[in-house]
């Protein structure tokens, strides 16, 4: 399905590798495994914005003139269901957000964290900017259309606006 586009690895001067659930040097492990080494490899972890962040950083490095060629890639191995704490041997960086969210909107043990984070953000966007629920539904529909083209995406079922609007809203 995926094929190499003929880029000679010798041209790559920096790599930006996005993932969330891998351990600290998963980018190096992935790139060394395909023979790409001897360059700076930056591991990027920005939760749901990880892929976009890796691409932005690679683009920024090229645009700045620091380098001529960068590679951005991402990978993740997720399991079905709600996101969970994977590394219990260290503090979870989301705890500050969790504490703040809990003080602002409360916390419902029966609803996954991510749904409450994004649901709360959606509610605040609606309040501050007057965004309609229909507009947010259209965003979900567009995301599902793109995800449906990736057989490895965890949520790869295309959904309609009517389906999205028929779901329960998270208001805490």
Can you describe what each PLM-predicted range is?
Residues 1-5, 170-172:
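Conserved small/polar residues in nucleotide/adenosyl-binding loops
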Residues 17-71, 77-117, 154-169:
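Conserved catalytic cysteine-centered active-site region
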Residues 71-72, 135:
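A structural signal for short, well-ordered beta-strand segments and their strand-loop junctions
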Residues 18, 73, 139-143:
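Short acidic/histidine-centered micro-motifs embedded in hydrophobic/aromatic stretches
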Residues 4, 16-17:
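Short secondary-structure capping/turn segments at boundaries of alpha-helices and beta-strands
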Residues 3-11, 125-130:
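Phosphate/pyrophosphate-binding loops at sites that engage ATP/ADP/AMP, CoA/4′-phosphopantetheine
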Residues 8-14, 38-40, 134-135:
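Short acidic capping loops at alpha-helix termini that bridge into adjacent secondary structure
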Residues 108-160:
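N-terminal leader/propeptide and maturation segments of large enzyme subunits in energy/redox metabolism
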């Amino acid at each position: 399905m995926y094929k190499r586009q003929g880029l000679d690895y010798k041209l790559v001067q920096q790599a930006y590798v996005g993932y969330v659930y891998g351990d600290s040097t998963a980018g190096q492990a992935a790139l060394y495994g395909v023979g790409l080494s001897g360059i700076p490899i930056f591991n990027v972890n920005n939760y749901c914005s990880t892929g976009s962040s890796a691409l932005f950083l690679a683009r920024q490095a090229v645009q700045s003139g620091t380098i001529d060629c960068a590679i951005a890639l991402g990978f993740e191995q997720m399991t079905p269901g709600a996101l969970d704490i994977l590394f219990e041997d260290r503090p979870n960086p989301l705890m500050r957000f969790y504490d703040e969210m809990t003080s602002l909107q409360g916390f419902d043990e029966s609803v996954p964290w991510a749904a409450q984070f994004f649901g709360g953000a959606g509610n605040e966007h609606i309040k501050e900017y007057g965004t309609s629920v229909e507009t947010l539904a259209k965003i979900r529909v567009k995301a599902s259309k793109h995800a449906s083209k990736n057989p490895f995406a965890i949520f790869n079922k295309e959904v309609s606006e009517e389906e999205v609007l028929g779901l329960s809203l998270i208001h805490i």
